[in-house]
Amino acid sequence: NSGILSRQYKSLIVPICVNIMLAVSLNLVTGFLGELSLGHAGFMSIGAYTSALISINTSFLPPALSFFIAVVCGCILAAVFGFLIGVSVLRLRGDYLAIVTLAFGEIIKSVINYLNFTGGSKGLSKIPLYSDYNNFTVVFIIMVICIVLISNLINSRDGRAIKSIRDNDIAAESIGIKISKYKVSAFVIAAGFAGLAGSLYAHNVGIIKPNIFDYNKSIEILVFVVLGGMGNIPGSIISAIILTVLPEFLRGADNLRMLLYAIVLILMMIFNNSKFKANLSLNKTFRKLGKED
C-alpha cells in the first residue's frame, strides 16, 4: 500500500511543476502588468500540441534530442501567438481584454478540434513519455529556471517599468516608458512559458484532447494567481501546490470533499486578504513617518 501511495503522490510532482509555471507566468501579465487575461490555456494548448506532433514525427531521433526540439518549438510557437495577441490588444483593457483573450483560447480549441492532423476531438495519443513520475528531475529544473527568470525580470529595471504601467500607465508614459513594448513583451514571455508548461504536460500524460484546454483551464490558472495574491510569486507557487494536491488528499472524503475544498479556498482568500491589509497599513505608516521627517 505504501508503494502505491508513494507512486500516486510522485505522479503529482509533474502536474504541480506545470501548474506553478502556468501560475507564475500568468501572474506576470495579470498581477504585475495589471491586465486580465483569460486565454492562458490557449497558449498552453499550442505548446502541448506542437511539441506532441514534433515528438511523434521525430521518433527516429534520440529521445532526449527529440524531446528538446519538441519543447523548444512548443515554447517558441506559443510565444509567437503571444506576440500576435499582445499587439492586437494593446488598446484594450479590463473586461474587453478579458473577452478577447477568452475568445482567443476558445478559437484555438475549436481549430484544434477540427484539424485532422491534431486528431480532432479524439486528440493525440502515443505521445512519448519523457517526464513521468519516475523522471521528473528535468521538469523540476525547468520550473525552477522559470521562477528564477520571472523573479529576476520583476526585480529588474524592466520589471519596475511593467509595474509602473499597472499602477498608472499615463504617468509611466509621461516619463518615457514605452508602454506598448512592455505590454507585448509581458504577453510574449507569459505565453512562451505557458507553451513550455503545455509541452511538459503533454509528455507527462501521453494523451491530449482539445477539451482539456478549454476556458475552465484558463479560469483554474487564474484562480491560482488570485488566491496566491496578484503580483505575488511565492503566493502563486503555494496556491498552485495546494490546489493541485488538495483534490488527491480529499479523494477519499466522498461527500465531504467539495465542502472541505471550499473551506480551504475561503481560508486562503481570508489569509491573503488579511496579509494585503497588513501590508497596506504598513505602507501608510511608513508614508506618515516619511512626511513627519
Regions found by a protein language model. Name each.
Residues N1-D293:
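Transmembrane alpha-helices and adjacent helix-loop boundaries
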